[in-house]
């Protein structure tokens, strides 16, 4: 299932016939039809009992509220993008949670990105902790990681994963709510078989 036309793709590399993700994407695999796991996982959404999932979520959130007492119910990693706004809306307005918003700043925020983050905090009245590594450190890490693993923002990915967990542990916050689906992101998991 090597795509016959170039379309800006590198010849000899396998691509998903639906979304064009290359085989070089970490964790990706393809079925016999040439469709990646992430695309197959996306199909699973049509067959999920969403009412049962809602009940599971409600139980998890209620348990977190009970454990938190008067403290924060959950840690909410946010960047200020559309996903952050949606997560904050659902947690605060739909479920009535009191999240602590956290941001690992890669130190490359655009003016618009910074504004959006501040707006999200204001709209949902969120307390917020942000960690911003020194610009010199960020630049060193970017240079080293682009050479070592081909990703100049490796420190971003690591920080976005580690910082919220550190905050949840430090402040004994019982729940961490992420805003992306690993089932659709890179195919290492599915909706039926999570990581």
Per-range role (PLM):
Residues 4-195:
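ATP-dependent adenylation/nucleotidyltransferase module used to activate substrates
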């Amino acid at each position: 299932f090597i795509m016959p036309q170039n379309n800006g793709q590198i010849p000899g590399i396998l691509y998903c016939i639906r979304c064009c993700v290359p085989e070089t994407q970490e964790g990706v695999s393809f079925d016999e039809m040439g469709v990646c796991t992430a695309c197959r996982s996306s199909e699973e959404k049509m067959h999920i009992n969403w009412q049962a999932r809602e009940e599971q979520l409600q139980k998890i959130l209620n348990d977190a509220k009970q454990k938190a007492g008067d403290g924060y119910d959950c840690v909410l990693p946010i960047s200020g993008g559309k996903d952050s706004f949606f997560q904050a809306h659902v947690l605060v307005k739909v479920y009535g949670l009191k999240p602590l918003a956290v941001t690992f700043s890669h130190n490359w925020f655009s003016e618009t990105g910074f504004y959006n983050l501040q707006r999200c905090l204001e709209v949902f009245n969120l307390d917020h902790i942000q960690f911003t590594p020194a610009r010199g450190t960020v630049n060193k890490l970017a240079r080293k990681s682009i050479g070592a693993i081909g990703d100049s923002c490796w420190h971003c990915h690591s920080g976005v994963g580690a910082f919220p967990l550190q905050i949840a542990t430090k402040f004994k916050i019982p729940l961490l709510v992420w805003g992306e689906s690993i089932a659709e992101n890179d195919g290492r998991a599915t909706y039926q078989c999570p990581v």
